[in-house]
Curated annotation (Swiss-Prot):
Subunit field text: NDH-1 can be composed of about 15 different subunits; different subcomplexes with different compositions have been identified which probably have different functions.
Localization per record: Cellular thylakoid membrane
A GO-annotated cellular component: plasma membrane-derived thylakoid membrane
Residue ranges of the TM segments: 14-34, 42-62, 79-99, 108-128, 132-152, 167-187, 206-226, 240-260, 276-296, 302-322, 330-350, 374-394, 409-429
GO function terms (MF aspect): NADH dehydrogenase (ubiquinone) activity; quinone binding
Function: NDH-1 shuttles electrons from an unknown electron donor, via FMN and iron-sulfur (Fe-S) centers, to quinones in the respiratory and/or the photosynthetic chain. The immediate electron acceptor for the enzyme in this species is believed to be plastoquinone. Couples the redox reaction to proton translocation, and thus conserves the redox energy in a proton gradient. Cyanobacterial NDH-1 also plays a role in inorganic carbon-concentration.
One Gene Ontology term from the biological process aspect of the record: photosynthesis, light reaction
Keyword Nucleus carried by entry: no
Protein name as catalogued: NAD(P)H-quinone oxidoreductase subunit 2
Amino acid sequence: MPNEIFTINLNAQAIIPEAFILLGIVGTLLVDLAGEKTASKWAPIICYLSIGSSLFSLALQWSNPVNSAFLGSFNSDNLAIAFRAIIALSTLVSLLISWRYTEQSGSPIGEFAAIVLSATLGAMLLCGSTDLISIFISLETLSVASYLLSGYLKRDPRSSEAALKYLLVGSAAAAVYLYGSSFLYGLSGSTNLATIGLEIINKPSFITSLALVFVLSTVAFKIAAVPFHQWTPDVYEGSPTPVVAFLSVGSKTAGFAFAIRILSTTFSSFDEEWKLLFTILAILSMALGNVVALAQTSMKRMLAYSSIGQAGFVMIGIVSGTQDGLSATVLYLAAYLFMNLGAFSCVILFSLRTGSDRILDYSGLYQKDPLITLGLSLCLLSLGGLPPMLGFFGKIYLFFAGWANHQYLLVIIGLVTSVISIYYYISVIKMMVVKEPQEASEIVKSYPEINWGIVGMPPLRVALYTCVAVTALGGILSNPLFKLANTAVSETPFLQEIIAMANNIS
């Protein structure tokens, strides 16, 4: 009988999607041992099977979620399923755009794939972790793999510098999280998020506020929110571009999932305090991220500051704390996956053909490569929030949710900074399209001839076409996508409790 009860409480089926990722890690490491030629052939196939199986198992869990597993340390509720699916998809696209880049850099493919899958495993586990210990293990799994990926180009001093900076700042963030967790454990005597939330309701104190600040600092680091963003531009510029693409979506999505769960569960009695702090972070991120992006000359640094601003937009939905706001958050992160990775696909293709990352070198690109120009233009317009792109509808849902919840200042600043972002996105597009042939950059003048045939497309081109198509046409499906996001929120018990409490208070 005790063994049966233990098995029921374990609910190991909750982590079947992560188990497939783990099998993929083992498989890629084994083929890597067989030699680079074998790894180049089989590592991509193993990754596709691993991620595809994980996504399929997540789809099966959608109608039968597990709301408590591993003695309450992990939840595979609908919200966790949605975030884990976004992360798995971002990994799939990131790997598609990385194979050619990794081969050209002379790096081992099997080893690279294993580290990317390890980061994915940590990110997916973080989305459903409901215990301070499981959160820390997931955070560190994601973080250590991210450090390795940032410094993967061992012969490139910029990559090594990026990895060292990321390691130092990330280690400090982990230490801050542990310090805050020790306060929470000392106040409650438990490591379970829900139990801690119940225990500290009647214990408002300086220590509790300090724990909130420490935990929020860790969240801000993971989502690259101002003023915890300093690592982002340098790491993005120095790291391999496919790694930057993954970190900008997969790692950030895991950070937002972590934020929603711990703030809504553990600090539900400090609702006003953490929402005020989150509002400040959102305003600073939207303002600084988009304003500083105006002055960038590197495409990767511009996208780095753009991602900081995008984090500020997503925070509007979390601060609103309503059904529509949280649903808009899920929808926008799904949209961000395609429009951001689509932009990075174009940047990688351009850098592989030219070796350049400078924005000025894109001058006149339309004359030599109209398809990259079109793809990058559509993705940048979507990031700026122009209709009828998918990003426009994502932002509209966020702004409507914020306005309905009386977050007027946040929405107004969001609208103003969106206009600023449109300016620097359109500046890049104008440079690619408007320049006359004689005004094209020297890089573009010597641009190689391109065959854009459909037959035998390499993975990078498949990823580019898919992301651009979803970005451009996804606006048509924005309503069904929002309904899916709404289901993820409405079918998640802990969120419904929080939303009901907020409605009663209002």
